Amino acid sequence: MTEGRRRQFKVGRVVSNKMQKTVVVAVDYLKPHPLYRKIVRRTSKFHAHDEQQCQIGDVVRIGETRPLSKTKRWEVVEIIKRNEEA
């Protein structure tokens, strides 16, 4: 029997919750430009499973999980900070 690898976690903000039980989470990271070596902010978007709890603007922690659909491989583990405006 093989051991599974360690589960990855990412922290990002919810940018869309228009789907049922799915949110889109934007995760920012810094990466150097390949030629000029200036640090540039980049954004990746992940579809994550959510049981109708998150609102747009919430800061959440997402964790890797088994494939739930064609695009969903992440689930919301916890809501770190609620959006005050919503």
From Swiss-Prot:
Enumerate the CDD domains for this protein.
Ribosomal_uS17
Subunit structure comment from the entry: Part of the 30S ribosomal subunit.
Gene Ontology cellular-component annotations: cytosolic small ribosomal subunit
Top-rank lineage group of the source organism: Bacteria
The GO molecular function terms of this record are: rRNA binding; structural constituent of ribosome
Q: Which gene encodes it?
A: rpsQ
Q: Which PROSITE patterns match?
A: RIBOSOMAL_S17 (PS00056)
Q: What does this protein do?
A: One of the primary rRNA binding proteins, it binds specifically to the 5'-end of 16S ribosomal RNA.
Protein name (record):
Small ribosomal subunit protein uS17
Family the UniProt entry places it in: Belongs to the universal ribosomal protein uS17 family.
Entry-linked NCBIfam families? PRK05610.1 (NF004123), uS17_bact (TIGR03635)
Sorted alphabetically, the keyword list is: Ribonucleoprotein, Ribosomal protein, RNA-binding, rRNA-binding
